[in-house]
């Protein structure tokens, strides 16, 4: 081997030895810092280094957290939807999800994956960052980033500093607008309920077949309701002009089996709104109620079924706060503050539905004008409702027994659910309708014997 080759080899060995020594020293220093330096000091030094080097960087990073106080961060949700359309071949990891009743695959960015977007010739880099925090460290009751999750998620959007105004004034509004179209196009309806352990919303896919076409409801009531719903979603400017929160309230009342739940599903399908089914008996106090209500999304329906049984709806004049720390209750005033109080303006395009079997049991405070905008009586089955049921279940528009059946329906109280049950008893139309006649005749005899 020549002296020149030996010299190069010796130089390489020296360089490798130096690199190995530096690496070993770095590992040792890192171990010492982690083991012996307090976390506060470590964070302070790291923060100082980051601030020092940031002065020499042309880059700026916008941190977009999942929650902004009590509410979902609109920009975070928009970024999640928008970036699903920007995943390229260079992306290494993606998250794919499809529930049984979903028609489309949901594709989102996995944590620590970079997604590059170009807007007006400007390069913008997105990264999803997930930070795990112990539950015991959650101490901020005003921030859902800290109160509900053990994993805090945020997007980091990086760009050149000189494009800051463009990002804030043009790019992010563009992302929000595009995301709204994407979500509406691929939206799968969901129904949310409260997890009793964590006191947060959990959801499943809503695949309820009820529509206004199939609903056994008085035609005039149905027509008025559909017109009211369509008018509501088109009047954002109107609500802002008159100074009212963009919400609508409906009270559905009537005996069990008259289709209150089916009507709620029909409203959700008609408007493409998610449903939040709130069981007030599962909550301990007004603070939990407020936190849940503030975390509901826009374009949604809040449902409180059997409102007369859910909480002790006493008059607000006697609805005093209880200072006993063991006292657990959701009060009428706490609920009404969200329905039409100051908290009602936190959120847009929301529908509130209360149901009850006995309207007369409700506190007058719930029934006053302007609180529930429409009171919809879910009555016993009518001849018109029967014809809708016959069309849905038997696929017929007329039959020789219709006149007799309709006469019975006018004379007795029978719910649409009872009629529907009879219509499912056979595949033979004649046999089913004859069975319905016998059922109605027997029911009339029972009613007469009680008179």
UniProtKB/Swiss-Prot annotation:
The lineage of its organism: Eukaryota, Viridiplantae, Streptophyta, Embryophyta, Tracheophyta. It is an enzyme of class 3 (hydrolase). Its cofactor is Mg(2+). This is AAA-ATPase At3g50940. InterPro entries: AAA+_ATPase (IPR003593), AAA_N_dom (IPR025753), ATPase_AAA_core (IPR003959), ATPase_AAA_CS (IPR003960), Mitochondrial_chaperone_BCS1 (IPR050747), P-loop_NTPase (IPR027417). GO terms for biological process: response to salt stress. PROSITE patterns: AAA. Belongs to the AAA ATPase family. BCS1 subfamily. Keywords: ATP-binding, Hydrolase, Magnesium, Nucleotide-binding, Signal. Residues 1-25 form the signal peptide. It comes from the Eukaryota. It comes from Arabidopsis thaliana. Induction: Induced in roots by salt stress. The keyword Hydrolase applies. GO terms for molecular function: ATP binding; ATP hydrolysis activity. ATP binds at residues 254-261. Its EC number is 3.6.1.-. It catalyses: ATP + H2O = ADP + phosphate + H(+).
């Amino acid at each position: 081997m020549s002296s020149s080759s030996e010299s190069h080899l010796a130089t390489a060995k020296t360089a490798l030895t130096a690199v190995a020594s530096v690496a070993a020293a770095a590992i040792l220093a890192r171990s010492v810092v982690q083991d012996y330096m307090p976390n506060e000091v470590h964070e302070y030094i790291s923060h100082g280094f980051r601030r020092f080097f940031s002065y020499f960087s042309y880059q700026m990073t916008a941190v977009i957290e999942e929650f902004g106080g009590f509410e979902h961060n609109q920009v975070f949700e928009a970024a999640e939807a928008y970036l699903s359309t920007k995943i390229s071949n260079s992306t290494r990891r993606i998250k794919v999800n499809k529930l049984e009743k979903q028609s489309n695959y949901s594709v989102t960015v996995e944590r620590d994956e970079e997604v590059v977007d170009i807007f007006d010739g400007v390069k913008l880099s997105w990264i999803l960052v997930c930070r795990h925090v112990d539950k015991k460290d959650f101490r901020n009751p005003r921030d859902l980033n800290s109160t509900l999750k053990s994993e805090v998620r945020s997007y980091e959007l990086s760009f050149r500093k000189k494009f800051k105004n463009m990002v804030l004034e043009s790019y992010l509004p563009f992302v929000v607008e595009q995301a709204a179209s994407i979500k509406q196009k691929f939206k799968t309806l969901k129904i949310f309920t409260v997890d009793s352990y964590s006191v947060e919303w959990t959801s499943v896919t809503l695949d309820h077949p009820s529509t206004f076409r199939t609903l056994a409801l008085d035609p005039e009531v149905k027509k008025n309701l559909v017109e009211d719903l369509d008018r509501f979603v088109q009047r954002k400017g109107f609500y802002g002009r008159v100074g009212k929160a963009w919400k609508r309230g409906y009270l559905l009342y009537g005996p069990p089996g008259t289709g209150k739940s089916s009507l709620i599903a029909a409203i959700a399908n008609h408007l493409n709104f998610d449903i939040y089914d709130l069981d007030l008996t599962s909550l301990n106090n007004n603070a939990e109620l407020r936190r849940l209500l503030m975390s509901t999304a826009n374009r949604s329906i809040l449902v409180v079924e059997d409102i007369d049984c859910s909480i002790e709806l006493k008059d607000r004049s006697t609805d005093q706060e209880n200072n006993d720390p063991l006292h657990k209750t959701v009060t009428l005033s706490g609920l009404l503050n969200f329905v039409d109080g100051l908290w009602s303006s936190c959120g847009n395009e929301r529908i509130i539905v209360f149901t009850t079997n006995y309207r007369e049991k409700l506190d007058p405070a719930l029934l006053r004008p302007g609180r529930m905008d429409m009171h919809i009586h879910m009555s016993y089955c009518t001849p018109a409702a029967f014809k809708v049921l016959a069309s849905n279940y038997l696929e017929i528009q007329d039959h020789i027994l219709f006149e007799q059946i309709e006469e019975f329906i006018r004379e007795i109280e029978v719910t649409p659910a009872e009629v529907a049950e009879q219509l499912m008893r056979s595949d033979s139309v004649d046999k089913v309708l004859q069975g319905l006649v016998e059922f109605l005749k027997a029911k009339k005899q029972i009613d007469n014997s009680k008179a």
